[in-house]
């Protein structure tokens, strides 16, 4: 089975700042994975590598492969990888209607523009995806009039419209109240139970659904651990990762943290 992501000895800069030096990381498609780390650990840069927004420094001894390929046309990559990020929600076109939010996924744009066109099959696919997520009554509503949770679910539908092999979720419950968080996480769990692979990027342990089995710890631009969730998510490891005393409590398959 192909690896979702394979990085070897990659050095990556954001502007003049080096975020990764000789980074090596594998994420397999045989299971769902959570990438955990404090702010500044390199999580956002890793997401940009996945989405081909940035590239590593060229070297004959390094590579970044996504589904075993180093070079992608971004529009083709979206058929394999659907990304839902908090930053996209913040920057999305406010006056876009619900249907157009989902249709924009076919172009990877943050709105629908006059030069874009859609086939009947694409429109029907968008509508069926909206319906599957229980959003059909909002199909004609403007994005800016929706609740944060409704917006997040429309962006999830936008990512799903290609039926990608893998969903990448960046801090999935950020900005959501408890009720919306629980509903959104249940949607994610439903997708995983139906066979969808998830890569979840977060610094909030409570966002990690029980179905995720693999964990990557990222700190200061380095992978400090990569292994099974039940072995890595413990009080000592998280205390070391976040450099503050933490106690871990497990309930109903979820992990919670409290001050140590």
Language-model features and meaning:
Residues 5, 19-22:
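Conserved structural motif at the start of ABC-family nucleotide-binding domains
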Residues 103, 118-138:
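Conserved ABC ATPase "signature" region
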Residues 116-118, 142-146:
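Conserved ABC ATPase signature
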Residues 167-171:
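Catalytic Walker B motif of ABC-type/P-loop ATPase nucleotide-binding domains
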Residues 208-210:
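A short, surface-exposed alpha-helical micro-motif characterized by mixed small hydrophobic
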Residues 239-260:
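ABC ATPase nucleotide-binding domains
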């Amino acid at each position: 089975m192909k690896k979702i992501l394979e990085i070897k000895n990659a050095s990556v800069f954001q502007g003049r700042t080096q975020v990764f030096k000789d980074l090596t990381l594998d994420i397999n498609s045989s299971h769902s994975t959570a990438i955990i780390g404090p702010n500044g650990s390199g999580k956002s840069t890793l997401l940009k590598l996945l989405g081909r927004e940035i590239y590593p420094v060229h070297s004959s001894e390094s590579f970044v492969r996504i589904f075993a390929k180093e070079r992608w046309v971004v529009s083709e990559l979206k058929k394999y990888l659907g990304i839902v990020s908090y930053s996209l929600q913040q920057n999305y076109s406010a006056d876009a209607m619900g249907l157009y939010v989902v249709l924009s996924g076919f172009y990877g744009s943050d709105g629908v523009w006059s030069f874009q066109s859609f086939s009947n099959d694409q429109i029907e696919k968008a509508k069926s995806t909206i319906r599957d997520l229980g959003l059909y009554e909002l199909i004609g509503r403007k994005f800016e009039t929706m609740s944060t949770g409704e917006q997040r679910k429309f962006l999830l539908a936008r990512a799903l419209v290609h039926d990608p092999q893998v969903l990448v979720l960046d801090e999935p419950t950020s900005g959501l109240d408890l009720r919306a968080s629980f509903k959104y996480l249940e949607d994610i769990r439903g997708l995983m139970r139906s066979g969808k692979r998830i890569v979840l990027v977060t610094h909030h342990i409570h966002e990690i659904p029980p179905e995720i089995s693999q964990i990557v710890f990222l700190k200061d631009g380095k992978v400090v651990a990569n292994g099974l969730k039940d072995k890595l998510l413990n009080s000592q490891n998280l205390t070391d990762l976040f450099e503050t005393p933490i106690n871990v409590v497990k309930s109903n398959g979820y992990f919670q943290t409290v001050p140590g």
